[in-house]
């Protein structure tokens, strides 16, 4: 069994977990998340904790058990605390503005780019060059952040573009004469 799957997922107070076949639903004060667990993984709830074990006769069941445990742990953290992802806009005239359920980005194109946020994700702009994404679903936040970054990735010579707040952009030296 994988080392990750051996550790149980503790369920904090105020979080309800329901298991219906292979469909696991986690409800918390912030939101509710559901996920279908792979058939090769057996999930048990006892004493306020979820345990994951591989089923016999499935190839790769050990790996699936570890993956399922990590995904469910992220769900529990998401419904209790939530996740945040910060983006920075680097470049002259690069700006972001939140308009209801979408973000308007000025990224040097001839037109502003409108990015509609999916349900469950909120955005705020503490300054014109910063975007903070918040939500309960870790995978969805990462996907939205990657989609926004893909509009204008950091270029390697000046570092202009949309980058994650903790990202270090390696810059190249300019061509010498």
Curated annotation (Swiss-Prot):
Signal peptide range: none
Keyword annotations of the record: Ribonucleoprotein, Ribosomal protein, RNA-binding, rRNA-binding
Example GO biological process: cytoplasmic translation
GO CC, any one term: cytosolic large ribosomal subunit
Pfam families in the record: Ribosomal_L6
GO molecular function: rRNA binding; structural constituent of ribosome
Oligomeric form and interacting partners: Part of the 50S ribosomal subunit.
Role: This protein binds to the 23S rRNA, and is important in its secondary structure. It is located near the subunit interface in the base of the L7/L12 stalk, and near the tRNA binding site of the peptidyltransferase center.
Family per record: Belongs to the universal ribosomal protein uL6 family.
Name of the molecule in the record: Large ribosomal subunit protein uL6
Species annotation: Actinobacillus succinogenes (strain ATCC 55618 / DSM 22257 / CCUG 43843 / 130Z)
């Amino acid at each position: 069994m994988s080392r990750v799957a051996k550790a149980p997922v503790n369920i904090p107070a105020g979080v309800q977990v329901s298991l219906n076949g292979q469909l696991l639903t986690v409800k918390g004060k912030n939101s509710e998340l559901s996920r279908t667990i792979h058939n090769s993984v057996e999930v048990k709830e006892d004493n306020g904790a979820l345990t994951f074990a591989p089923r016999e006769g499935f190839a790769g069941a050990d790996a699936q058990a570890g993956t399922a445990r990590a995904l469910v742990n992220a769900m529990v953290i998401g419904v209790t605390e939530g996740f945040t992802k910060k983006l920075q806009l680097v470049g002259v005239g690069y700006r972001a503005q939140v308009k209801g359920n979408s973000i308007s980005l000025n990224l040097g194109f001839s037109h502003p780019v409108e990015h509609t946020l999916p349900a469950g994700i909120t955005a705020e702009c503490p300054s014109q060059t910063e975007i903070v994404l918040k939500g309960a679903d870790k995978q969805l936040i990462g996907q939205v952040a990657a989609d926004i970054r893909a509009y204008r990735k950091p270029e390697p010579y000046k570092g202009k573009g949309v980058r994650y707040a903790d990202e270090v952009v390696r810059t190249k030296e300019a061509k010498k004469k």
